């Protein structure tokens, strides 16, 4: 489906480092329990529940029970969510979900049904079911979310630092050099960046590299070339961080997208 990625996985000892997604995340837990940090909270999701993550929201992930967890996940594009919100709720602007975990067995079954329709090659059913579950979740747990646009002086420095790292991703400056370029101190920049984006600059940069590598893989670039293009030293370096954030190695991710 255009604008949508799907992942069906079981993890036992897997631990996702703090990362973000450009898309939304609907993760229907079918077995076990997933635990994850969302903001300052540690939350848990089990069978019949859905983990909901808004775009650009730092979060982690690990097993909440010794048996690990199994889930079926949908990653819908923000534009798709906005269009459905506009059609069903007349919501405009920054739309998102207000809770990281919701207890809704019917919606969880709809997420599974989206996967099964896609696996069967039934694009019409998959798209219809996706819109149905999205509208349901938006009606019960959606709303306008606060804009992340920084306003304070420190936050403006953080935004400028982020823009520099985005532009010079393959050859970024040190924290000291970056702070000097922005006319602030390294410690002040570190504190402002963490406050604005939920993680320090070096963690954000790794996450941003993975996100850009994912787009390059979607465009057909081989993993080794994608690794160099985003500033990783080599493909194993990309493999390690990509798997920590996405859950599968870049080669497996790309093969799954080509099916």
Segments from the language model and where they lie:
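N-terminal regulatory/effector-sensing and dimerization cores
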Residues: 1-93
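Short amphipathic alpha-helical/adjacent loop interface patches that line ligand
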Residues: 78, 130, 158
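Sigma70-family region 2
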Residues: 60-64, 140-141, 194
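Hydrophobic alpha-helical connector segments
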Residues: 122-130, 171-174, 222-223
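Short, Lys/Arg-enriched N-terminal segment that forms or immediately precedes the first helix
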Residues: 142-149, 191-197
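Amphipathic alpha-helical segments enriched in hydrophobic/aromatic residues interleaved with Lys/Arg
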Residues: 87-148
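Basic/polar phosphate-binding segments, predominantly the helix-turn-helix DNA-binding elements
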Residues: 160-166, 171-211, 218, 227-256
